Swiss-Prot record:
GO cellular component: cytoplasm
Organism this protein belongs to: Cereibacter sphaeroides (strain KD131 / KCTC 12085) (Rhodobacter sphaeroides)
Cofactor: Mg(2+)
Binding residue positions for substrate: T299, V300, T301, G302, R303, K304, R305
Full protein name: Adenylosuccinate synthetase
Length: 430
């Protein structure tokens, strides 16, 4: 029995929510290990739609333990709102079903204010942040001045933490022309929210290791995608945390030996939200068609996603950096009806052919895609549950992707419904 890490292998929005939900039915523990409430995921269960952005996907399934690990930055007010919304939808949530790492860093109102002020004043090169304070919260974590969940339990400690934080933030705010932090108002907000958060606070590292020793199945749920990784993504147009599979261990306090299978979620084409390089991007009728058919709008922000053909170079790269064992290929049905499909198989930069994306941002921006054309199909793949249900051209497309990314397909998703899935390799089996 293997513990499974699910990571997005593109720029996020690959359909992780459905796959995680599909796997979570058989998992005992579902843990988030990085990010914040900036990455939304949509679940469709028995026709009912759930939109989550902070809580693990397993929260909607009774009898599962959902975990928010120390690698996550936590907005406590958003947490309470998301819990309330799910409860209104009939989902039962208690400290028995949800656990939050005591050492998880809090996102405060001042983080969102700083995030938005920087983005609005940075006219030269906007990063495309959601403005929710995730980046500034991670900055405070690395700067060793953050307020953590455990700090909410002691008022004296909390006051000291706020004072230390204000020294840094008030200086920043002066430079940006923002009013200083209202110390008493912030403390009052934290005191008010503390009783609603602390019941869920636990030593996650300890519980996770106990679960592992007891033979429980653990599913590690990543947010966003590996191309947004702070180290291996398209820097600086990235998120503020590590997104690749290795972060699952660091972000929950469990050893890397606990990871048995890494499942990379890959869309059958490519999308990106916000700024940054996108070599295979389409700015024509085909790109519009992909966006309309795939309903490519962000779960959290509602922003229209940029669309392009499948980029095998990037996915091969992310499969390597995350040690992907197999991929789940999603949204194949969006390609139904295209007469011709294209796959990016390399880049050209200054007259030289490359088999990887260079690390320098200026070089990334100058890369032009080298495409390989494949025959499309007119038949529908929507709802297919076996290889026999797929048109021959669709099977060839999938097989070509496997060859180019040097990684096998473990799952194939053919609609948002969780049961419309073709299983090739069971990630939970050793």
């Amino acid at each position: 029995m293997a513990n499974v890490v699910v990571v997005g292998a593109q720029w996020g929005d690959e359909g992780k929510g459905k796959i995680v939900d599909w796997l979570s039915e058989r998992a005992d523990v579902i843990a988030r290990f990085q990010g914040g409430h900036n990455a939304g995921h949509t679940l469709v269960i028995d026709g009912k739609v759930y939109k989550l952005s902070l809580l693990p996907s397993g929260i909607v399934r009774p009898g599962k333990l959902s975990v928010i690990g120390n690698g996550v930055v936590l907005d406590p007010w958003h947490l309470v709102q998301e819990i309330a919304k799910l409860r209104a939808d009939g989902v039962e949530i208690s400290p028995e079903s949800l656990m939050i790492a005591e050492n998880a860093v809090l996102i405060l109102p001042l983080h969102g204010e700083l995030d938005r002020a920087r983005e609005s004043q940075n006219s030269v090169a906007k990063i495309g942040t959601t403005g929710r304070g995730i980046g500034p919260a991670y900055e405070d974590k690395v700067g060793r001045r953050a307020i953590r969940v455990a700090d909410l339990a002691d008022e004296a400690t909390l006051a000291l933490r706020v004072d230390r934080l204000m020294v840094h933030h008030d200086a920043l705010r002066r430079g940006l022309g923002i009013e200083p932090v209202d110390r008493e108002a912030l403390l009052a907000q934290l005191r008010e929210i503390a009783p609603q958060v602390l019941p869920y606070a636990k030593p996650v590292w300890k519980v996770m290791n106990e679960m592992r020793k007891a033979g429980k199945r653990i599913l590690f749920e990543g947010a966003q995608g590996a191309l947004l990784d702070i180290d291996f993504g398209t820097y600086p147009y990235v998120t503020s945390s590590n997104v690749i599979a290795g972060q699952a261990a660091t972000g929950t306090g469990i050893g890397p030996g606990a990871i048995g299978f890494v499942l990379g979620i890959v869309k059958a084409y490519t999308t990106r939200v916000g700024e940054g390089p996108f070599p295979a991007e389409l700015q024509d009728a085909d790109g519009e068609r992909l966006g309309e058919r795939g309903r490519e709008f962000g779960t959290v922000t509602g922003r229209k996603r940029r669309c392009g053909w499948f980029d095998a170079v990037l996915v091969r790269q992310t499969c390597a950096t995350s040690g992907v064992s197999g991929i789940a290929l999603t949204k194949l049905d969006v390609l139904d009806g295209f007469e011709t499909l294209k796959i990016c198989v390399g880049y050209e930069l200054d007259g030289e052919r490359l088999d990887h994306l260079p690390i320098a941002a200026d070089q990334q921006a100058r890369c032009t895609p080298i495409f390989e054309e494949l025959e499309g199909w007119s038949e529908s793949t929507a709802g297919a549950r076996s290889w026999a249900d797929l048109p021959g051209a669709a099977v060839k497309y999938v097989r070509r992707i496997e060859e180019l990314i040097q990684c096998p397909v473990a799952l194939l998703s053919t609609s948002p419904e969780r049961d419309d899935t073709i299983l090739v390799t069971d990630p939970f089996e050793d």
